[in-house]
Design a protein with these regions (language model features):
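Conserved loop->alpha-helix
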Residues: 1-149
Length: 149
């Protein structure tokens, strides 16, 4: 489980097709406390750490995950919003984010609104009916409150 509060921005250092897509992601996390098998949200997608070094970790991205996300995201040099999994006792500042992707959205507008920004999104098909005013969504792993539908 995650909160949608981004704690680092990583960069894909290498991408290699090994059955699944193996990514090596450079990051600023102290990975000494990250076990193999731990979950890290990569732009909102819950992925499992399969290897690691001092300043990088590796994950395998399934074809199903690639097909349900913005597929150009999974390329060498791409930046990813990162969040370690929620631990008991951590501050809970966003909303519950599972990291299981339901679909994608197209950004159709971006405008300043007071001290923040208003983002217009177009969501295809069934997913749009699941979004409620004043509910929450995660966009690239970032917790956002829905103002209106």
């Amino acid at each position: 489980m995650f909160t949608g509060i981004i704690t680092d921005i990583g960069r894909i250092e290498a991408a290699e097709q090994k059955g699944d897509l193996r990514l090596r992601i450079g990051c600023g996390y102290d990975l000494s406390g990250v076990d193999l098998g731990a979950s890290i949200a990569c732009s909102g997608v819950c992925l499992t750490v399969v290897d690691k070094g001092d300043d990088w970790f590796a994950v395998d991205v399934s074809a199903e995950t690639v097909s349900r996300t913005a597929s150009d995201r999974w390329r060498e040099g791409a930046r990813l919003n990162l969040e370690r999994s929620l631990r008991l006792g951590d501050e809970f500042g966003g909303h519950i984010v599972t990291g299981h992707i339901d679909g994608t959205a197209e950004i159709i507008g971006l405008a300043p609104h007071g001290g923040s920004n208003r983002i217009g999104l177009r969501v295809a098909g069934e997913l749009g009916r699941s979004i409620a005013p004043k509910g929450s969504i995660a966009l690239d792993g970032v917790s956002l409150t829905v103002n209106d539908v």
